[in-house]
């Protein structure tokens, strides 16, 4: 049996092929561009992630028996905002973890909702890297894109969806979105019940 590990990083996707004894059979890295459309902004095209991941998988398995692949594991950059429309198409470039445009939205979350309340529910306070401030930024600055949102995903979850057809995330990444009630392990209505900025 063989297993694939996919790490969707900020500058490249790293892929590893391992056998059932934990021996590394192959390692591949594929780079993709990072865009800075304005000072302090950081974006990527999710299609670039997908294309380089697929190329990486082909390269990773070129000398392996593909029928022996028993599982795939996903990891990668956290907190980036990938928004999809009703047809699961990407609406705009992903806003990454290292993007600093959401200072006002973070101030709103920390001051109006409150750091204590945020911390109680999400085990975090709001920072510019997290997902919820990015959603609020899109709502305020790109209302036409906000109106089209049907699904919100994180970068590695988008790649997992493209490879499996399943929309999902994990508790660790969900907690950094500021949308997840960590204590009760469910999505929080905290932002939905608070006044909008």
Model regions and ranges:
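N-terminal glycine/serine-rich phosphate-binding loop of ATP-dependent small-molecule kinases
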Residues: 1-92, 120, 148
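Signature tryptophan residues that serve as conserved aromatic anchors
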Residues: 41, 49-50, 97, 137, ...
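Short beta-strand-loop/turn "lid" adjacent to the catalytic site in phosphate-handling enzymes
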Residues: 61-97, 125-129, 160-181
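A short alpha-helix-loop-beta-strand transition element characteristic
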Residues: 67-69, 116-126, 145-153
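Glycine-rich phosphate-binding loop plus the immediately following alpha-helix
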Residues: 98-137, 181-185
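Polyanionic/metal-chelating signatures
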Residues: 138, 159
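Conserved small/polar residues in nucleotide/adenosyl-binding loops
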Residues: 192-197
């Amino acid at each position: 049996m063989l297993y694939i590990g996919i790490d969707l990083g900020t500058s490249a996707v790293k892929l590893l092929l391992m056998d059932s004894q934990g021996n590394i059979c192959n390692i591949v890295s594929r780079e993709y561009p990072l865009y800075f459309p304005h000072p302090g902004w950081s974006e990527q095209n999710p299609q670039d992630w997908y294309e380089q991941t697929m190329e990486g998988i082909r390269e990773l398995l070129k000398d392996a028996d593909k029928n022996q692949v028993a599982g795939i594991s996903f990891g990668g950059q956290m907190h980036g905002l990938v928004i999809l429309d009703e047809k699961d198409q990407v609406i705009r470039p992903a806003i990454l973890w290292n993007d600093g445009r959401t200072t006002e939205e973070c101030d709103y979350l920390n001051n109006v909702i409150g750091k204590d309340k945020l911390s109680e529910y999400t085990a975090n306070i709001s920072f510019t890297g997290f997902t919820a401030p990015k959603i609020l930024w899109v709502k305020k600055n790109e209302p036409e894109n906000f109106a089209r949102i049907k699904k919100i995903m994180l970068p590695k979850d988008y790649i997992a969806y493209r490879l499996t057809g399943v929309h999902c995330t994990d508790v660790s990444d969900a907690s950094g979105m500021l949308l997840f009630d960590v204590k009760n392990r469910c999505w929080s209505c905290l932002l939905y019940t608070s006044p909008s900025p």
